[in-house]
Amino acid sequence: MSSKFIIDSMLPKYHQQFHHQQLFQSATTEAPAAYSSSSPSGSSPQHSSSSASTSPAARMYPYVSAAHHHHQAAAAAFGAAASGSMVPSFSSTASSALAAAVDAATDKSCRYTAGLAANVTPADSMVNYTLGQHHHNGAAVSAASSVSAASASMAVAAQFYHQAASAVVDPLNSCSQPAAPGGQPIPDIPRYPWMSITDWMSPFDRVVCGPNGCPRRRGRQTYTRFQTLELEKEFHFNHYLTRRRRIEIAHALCLTERQIKIWFQNRRMKLKKELRAVKEINEQARREREEQERHKQQQQEKQQKIEQQTHSSIHQHHHDPMKMSLDKSGGSDLLKAVSKVPT
């Protein structure tokens, strides 16, 4: 929930009634002030005569009272247009003031640009916003000039955000490129597809809220090929850096010490994972090799058993005919001996 909604809920009810009463009073009191502000002394928003009529509620709640200020500006412009018969040369200026008031009422995206155009700190932009609205009520000429100043300040702010985003996304190029002589703008650095996400975003919009309302972590740091190559070279010789060496590398690569330290931590963790993966692969290969050797040994044992069985069967068949021949010869000798027995 933004601060604007909190202020809307805290705003007292009599504040709107007070401004509705002032709406009809300003139609008669702001017209002479518009004529008196045509002098050089009344053209500045800080010394405008209408700034004295700022209500305390408008000082406390400048965002909520903006709509009432726009109504006051429209009423003042109508009053000036009605009295155009007294000063004929001011009628065209009053119509331009009316158009500027309507444009300011419809376009609320320039509420912070008045402070940037006047080289004022962002803390005073809230006060300058209320003074700018009273300046629309009091001075018609400065109203048209403030619209052009607001558009110019928007361009300046966009260029500032573009340079800030470029410096954050690519610190190497922002560090290595010196300022151009003669006050000329530095040429744009090459933009890559992954850098265009935060190109035209303000620093406040770059904070992304998560689903539970908490801000998410910042995006990962992108390193160039040169930076990655130098870091890999250093990691090849030293897995751990000393403080002095870390400072030297950070200065040489236009990075911070924290980025160097985090990169080396991640690289050591990556090496540890790679070694663990290689160890697991070697262990799996060793198991497969042992399994193959065991299977081969079992096959050899089976083959040896089969060979032994075949050899024993062949040897047994070779001894059986010899035994049968011996039995036959023994039987014939026994018959001969029996036949020779005397009677």
From Swiss-Prot:
Xref: SMART domains: HOX
Gene Ontology terms: cellular component: nucleus
Stretches the record annotates as Disordered: 29-54, 286-343
Record CDD domains: homeodomain (cd00086)
Positions with biased composition (Basic and acidic residues): 286-305
GO MF term (any one): DNA-binding transcription factor activity, RNA polymerase II-specific
Family per similarity comment: Belongs to the Antp homeobox family.
Function: Sequence-specific transcription factor which is part of a developmental regulatory system that provides cells with specific positional identities on the anterior-posterior axis.
Protein name per its UniProtKB record: Homeobox protein abdominal-A homolog
Source organism: Tribolium castaneum (Red flour beetle)
Gene from which this protein is expressed: ABD-A
